[in-house]
Amino acid sequence: MTEQSMRLDMAMGRASRTRRQFEATPVTAGEQQVPVVIVGAGPVGLALAADFRQQGVSCVVLEKHDGLSQGSRAICWAKRTLEICDRLGVATRMMHKGITWNLGKVFAGAASELLYSFDLQPVKDQKFPAFVNLQQYYTEEYFIEALADESPIRWQQRVDSLQVAHDGVWLTVAAPDTQYRLHCDWLIAADGSRSTVRELMGLDFAGRTFEDNFLIADVRMKAPFPAERRFWFNAPFNEGRTALMHQQPDNVWRLDFQLGGDIDRAAAVREENVTRRVRAMLGPEIDFDYEWVSLYTFQCRRMTRFVHDRVIFAGDAAHLVSPFGARGANGGLQDADNLAWKLARVIKGEANHALLESYNEERVYAADENLLNSTRSTDFMTPKSPAERALQQAVVGLAKDHPFARAFVNSGRLSVPCHQRSSALTTPDEHEFAAALQPGDVCLDAPLASADGRRWLLEHLGGRFVCLYFMDAHTPAPATVAATLPAGVALLPVSREARADAAHDATGVLSARYDARPGTTCLIRPDQHLAARWRQPDPPRIAAALRRATAISFTEN
């Protein structure tokens, strides 16, 4: 996303929120050595740092700026992102502060008529909602505070040059008062759409630029609107173009107006012009002031590859999508979730470079899925030709009275976890399963109680390989099954009856979602994707599936 007049104090003469800043991290001149360097302390870089800490891998995070992000960044955090953040220890704070929502509404026409509403969480009995709205600076702050004990973050440290060698990467890092050399075994570029690392390496970032301009106004107000996503086609208050409204914490609301392609960009962000648009949307009775105003266009791009020997790209540094669908930051957090456990195993000697190639395979596939959805959304929302405009109007016109047409109304296909069914790490089924969940999918949460107070399946998994074992009085005892598992795989026994040696599926929801019978066994990856499943525990097959899920089988003779 390309923004102009991004700062409110530049564009409109004032800013209403003080940005949290950090002093430059003291460093020693000379040469230093660390296993992993992460460039960028945004949500993706910070999530990687938190995950590496859990994995026992030392890392340093280099951040060229002096504090938290500001302005119109990510606000919509999807259920899968919340599940990842829960494992990393920050989701409770996100839920406490954020605005929970599951419902979206689509309006159209001169009367702003409601076309239809949709529930983004049709499958209930899960720990987290479909989305939580929370300003990006809060998410960053929660990660920074979680990492505060021996923090790996080096503030105001800029990468000036790099050289990739056979045994790692040499960086020249500029700090406010000095310059130093830093050697790492692995370099992760999580430094955003204008990635310094990508530029220094001269790597591609091919894609498409969209010409339409959009105005974001984050306004502070006490409004009577519900906590839901509200989207307008042909908005009467926005000259017949699209508009979007979202609630954020602190009585802040995100208002997004399509302006078109050929506009006076300087005039668009003048206070009187912004106020005219906001007032037309809200009506005359609601008082408001501005937290942030920005004008943006956006791009859909990705690198050809995300893994370049010992340099790995994640988040916006690797792929860039439009904001419609909230697929940017959420996709980046899934990058981090996919990468951290794989690189940790390579560093510990438990896997080889083939496992990192699977990060490239799986996350390029996910990026293409996000790019496709983002591009389709943008094309539908911003028709470029009379034919495209006619199609949009016809579909929108049918949607109110004809449910079949609603599937074709595209106001942003919202972020969902990417499945990895075709991944080389996934073992195909040998047995019949009726559940919608398939190998390669992210595990679907469900109630699961244990004596230690955990109440949900995903709370039991953590960032490790787990063998989920559904049992009853007639199946082998948990201790017997555990003794047959490969090293590094934890057993999670589940029973419909209350037992001291198993977690309790009291409602039966978990068993139903996994089409589990007594004996059903599932191997789950550290990023909580289902790697393989069987109708009975089979030690040789479990071992083979583990070798496949860690890419070891790819290099075995």
Language model features with spans:
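Helical substrate-recognition/capping region of FAD-dependent monooxygenase/halogenase enzymes
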Residues: 2-35, 39, 54-55, 109-111, ...
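A conserved short coil-to-beta-strand element within the FAD-binding core of flavoproteins
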Residues: 155-169
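Core beta-strand elements of the Rossmann-like FAD/NAD(P) dinucleotide-binding domain
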Residues: 32-34, 177-186
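Active-site-adjacent segment of FAD-dependent monooxygenases/related oxidoreductases
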Residues: 70-146
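N-terminal Rossmann-fold NAD(P) dinucleotide-binding loop
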Residues: 45-46
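Conserved FAD-binding catalytic core of PHBH/FMO-like flavoproteins
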Residues: 96, 105, 144-145, 166-170, ...
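Glycine-rich FAD pyrophosphate-binding loop
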Residues: 53-73
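FAD/FMN-dependent oxidoreductases across multiple families
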Residues: 11-18, 249-251, 266-331, 351, ...
